A protein has these predicted regions:
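A membrane-interface helix-boundary motif in multi-pass transporters
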Residues: 33-35, 39, 70-76, 157-178
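Intracellular terminal tails of multi-pass secondary transporters
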Residues: 163-237
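Extracytoplasmic gate region of multi-pass secondary transporters
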Residues: 1-56, 114-126, 148-152
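C-terminal transmembrane helical hairpin of 12-TM major facilitator-type secondary transporters
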Residues: 71-120
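Interfacial helix-cap and linker-helix signal at transmembrane-aqueous boundaries
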Residues: 26-30, 58-59, 63, 154-164
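Paired intracellular helix-loop junctions of major facilitator superfamily
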Residues: 31, 64-65, 97, 124-134, ...
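A late C-terminal transmembrane helix in Major Facilitator Superfamily
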Residues: 52-53, 130-162
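Transmembrane alpha-helical cores of Major Facilitator Superfamily
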Residues: 9, 42-46, 83, 108, ...
C-alpha cells in the first residue's frame, strides 16, 4: 500500500505540474499567441486519450494470454507512464527558444506516455483489495492530491521569470526526479497480491477457529489428566 501511495503521489505531482504550467511555458518561452497556445497545450492530452485505448488493450491481452503476470504488467506500464515522461522532461530542459517544434514533440511524448499509469498503479487498488478498492483509492488519492496543490505553487517559486529557459529546466528536472523515485519505489516494493485486511470476516473466522481448536486441545488435556487420576485411584484401591 505504501509503495502505491508513493508512486501515485509522484504521478499526481507530474500530472498537475504539466497540466497547469504547459500553457505558461509555451506562451512565455516561445512567445505563442493565445489561440495557438490553446491548441498546442491541448494536443498532448488529445494524443494521450488516443493512446489510452491501445495501451489498455495490449496490457489486458498480455495478462490474459499469460505472457505477463498481473504484477509484471502493472510495473511495466507504470514504468512507461512515469520514467518515459521523466526522460522527456530532462530533454525538454535543454530545448532552446529557437526549437519550439522539439519542445512540443517532447511535451506530447511526455503526456501521451503518462496514460500507461492507468494500467499500472491506478488499477493496483483492485489488486490489493477487491473489497476495499474504493476506500483505498480515496485514501491514496487524498494524500496524493496534496501534490496537486504543491506542484503549481513550487513551480511558481522556481519559475519566477516565465520566459527564462533555465528556470523551467530546474522545474522539469525536479519533476523528473520525483517521477523516477516514485516509480522506483513501486518497482521494488509494489505488489499485486491481495492483502490480508481485504477479508476481515475470514480473518475473524480464522481467529475463532484457532481459539476453538486451542480450547478443544486444552479440554482434551484436562480430560486426559482426570482419566489418569481416576486410573491411579483405582489402582490404589
Amino acid at each position: 500500500m505504501w509503495a502505491l501511495l508513493v508512486t501515485q503521489s509522484a504521478h499526481t505531482w507530474g500530472f498537475w505540474m504539466l497540466l497547469t504550467k504547459i500553457p505558461s511555458y509555451i506562451g512565455s518561452v516561445f512567445d505563442t499567441d493565445i489561440q495557438n497556445n490553446g491548441l498546442w497545450s491541448a494536443l498532448p492530452y488529445l494524443t494521450a486519450w488516443i493512446c489510452s485505448f491501445p495501451i489498455s488493450y495490449i496490457s489486458d491481452v498480455l495478462i490474459k494470454r499469460n505472457v505477463l503476470t498481473v504484477q509484471a504488467s502493472r510495473k511495466i506500464c507504470n514504468t512507461i507512464g512515469e520514467w518515459i515522461p521523466a526522460i522527456a522532461l530532462v530533454g525538454l530542459g535543454y530545448v532552446t527558444k529557437e526549437q519550439p517544434g522539439i519542445a512540443r514533440a517532447l511535451l506530447i511524448f511526455a503526456v501521451a506516455s503518462n496514460v500507461a499509469i492507468y494500467c499500472g498503479h491506478n488499477v493496483n487498488h483492485m489488486d490489493l483489495s477487491p473489497n476495499f478498492a474504493g476506500p483505498l483509492m480515496g485514501i491514496t488519492n487524498t494524500v496524493a492530491n496534496i501534490c496537486s496543490i504543491l506542484a503549481p505553487l513550487i513551480a511558481s517559486v522556481i519559475v519566477k521569470h516565465p520566459d527564462n529557459v533555465g528556470e523551467w529546466r530546474n522545474m522539469f528536472f525536479l519533476t523528473s526526479i520525483i517521477y523516477f523515485l516514485g516509480n522506483l519505489t513501486f518497482i521494488v516494493f509494489g505488489t499485486s497480491k491481495i492483502q490480508e485486511w481485504n477479508d476481515p470476516i475470514k480473518e475473524k473466522k480464522d481467529i475463532s477457529m484457532s481459539s476453538a481448536t486451542e480450547s478443544s486441545v486444552e479440554k482434551g488435556y484436562a480430560q486426559r489428566e482426570k482419566d489418569t487420576e481416576k486410573m491411579d485411584l483405582g489402582k490404589e484401591s
